[in-house]
Amino acid sequence: MRRAIEFLVAALVAASALKQPLPAQQTRGLRIAGAQIPVTRDVNANLVALEHAVQYAAAEKADILLTPEGSLSGYFADFDQGRTTAGLERITAAARRAGVALALGTCFQEPDDGRKYDELRFYARDGSYLGFHAKVLLCRRIANPTSRGEIDYFSTRPLRTFELGDVIVGGLICNDLWANPEWTPQADPHLTQQLAGKGARVIFQAVNSGLVQSADLELTRPYHESNLRLRARAGKLWIVVADAVDPEGRLANQCPSGVVDPSGNWALRVDSHDERFFAYTIELK
């Protein structure tokens, strides 16, 4: 009888434990800001736009600000290295004072090897430099193989991740994500999947997709958007994207700016005309 009672008590305790609610999963919010801004040859004009973006990010209490491809130097192979270096000191100092981390798109000539790179440079909130992602899928027009393109002017480096506090993130630049078959001499290495395999939870994509006013927009924009959404879903990734915009506000860019969630849906998306800033809190479990 005693053993039967002990068994019954144990069963009741086990049943009670099963009814207890599971502990809630801990979430961590990463507040991001993005800048859809004009990118020109004028480094000083670019700096003005970038400083406005930093001010916006600080007002939104963002952890990090993403800018478009070439947003400091201009998106040109013959960028002015001296002015870019001086501008880099100015914008990183502004971000440090504001307490905002940076994912800054710029072309840059690295002092360790003297080579030019199309970069996404990462800085922590205290201004410390975390390193850079170099564009991997450098472009050349496939239909005209004798033409010169990015691949003839810029070098690249191995894919890597970065740590923003306790969050592992990755950076990609424009064609790195969608490997446009008209502009990509290399095979598609599926860089989003590689970054997911390296533990990245969030990818920051700096874009300078080009401005068009033709039927091409009906083809290229859906291609870019579907790649963003499918690759986010495939890698269970958050993807934050910031594209350059027409300084005159007439032409549309070829890629939406905003935030795509791990289900492949837009969490936030901005209009493709004019300068736009945006902010969003990514909840990471």
Model-identified regions with their sequence ranges:
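Hydrophobic helical h-region of N-terminal Sec-dependent signal peptides
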Residues: 8-14
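Active-site catalytic loop in hydrolytic enzyme cores
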Residues: 112-202, 206, 217, 223, ...
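Cys-nucleophile CN-hydrolase/nitrilase-fold catalytic domain and related Cys-dependent amidase chemistry
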Residues: 43, 48, 52-126, 140-141, ...
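Active-site-proximal beta-strand/loop segments in catalytic clefts of secreted hydrolases
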Residues: 35-38, 67-70, 105-108, 133-136, ...
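Bacterial N-terminal signal peptides that target proteins for export
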Residues: 1-8
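CN hydrolase (nitrilase-like) catalytic-core segments centered on the catalytic cysteine
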Residues: 83-104, 178-277
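Short beta-strand segments enriched in small/hydrophobic residues
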Residues: 26-40
